[in-house]
Amino acid sequence: KSIICSRVKGVYSEINALLAGTADAETQAKYAEVLDQLPAMKELYAHRARLRKERGCIDFESGEVKLILDENGHCIDVKKRTSGESEAMIEEFMLLANQCAAHFARVKQIPFVYRVHEEPNGEKLERLHSLLQACGINDHFAKEVPTPKELSAILEGVRGTPFEQIVNTGMLRCMSKACYEEKPKGHY
């Protein structure tokens, strides 16, 4: 059981405006209690993002969409959802909180449920290999499981190209689903 005490009910778009320096006086007043903490949070996020990149963590584009509804609640449009720096910061801090909780439980030998992501299986990797070959991308891992760093390099290589979305989706489908177990088995 956990309790989260929020001092401010934050809204991503408002936090993004504060981070960008474009927030109006009303928004700044709403966040006065935490405003001076935002630069340190931004710096911590940037540091964690650098560490993640150095480790070769895979950074998938989510491709989330939002539904635009009319006054009757009927969908009239679908738009790609964009996220700003505040969403990325919160996601990073939630991951860090989970890692700290898991580490604490392991060190103190407290029973715990760990989130486990196993490496991709052979069949899914074969499909990814075929997709990459069809896109003219040499993957160098036809016979073995690639490291996350290798997959990350492929994603980085297609960023901004016509292949970006299909490779991102193909790689995401290749990943094993996360499961929860009593023993920490690591995270691919």
Kindly give the residue locations of the regions a language model identified.
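Conserved, carboxylate-rich catalytic/transport cores that coordinate ions
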Residues: 1-188
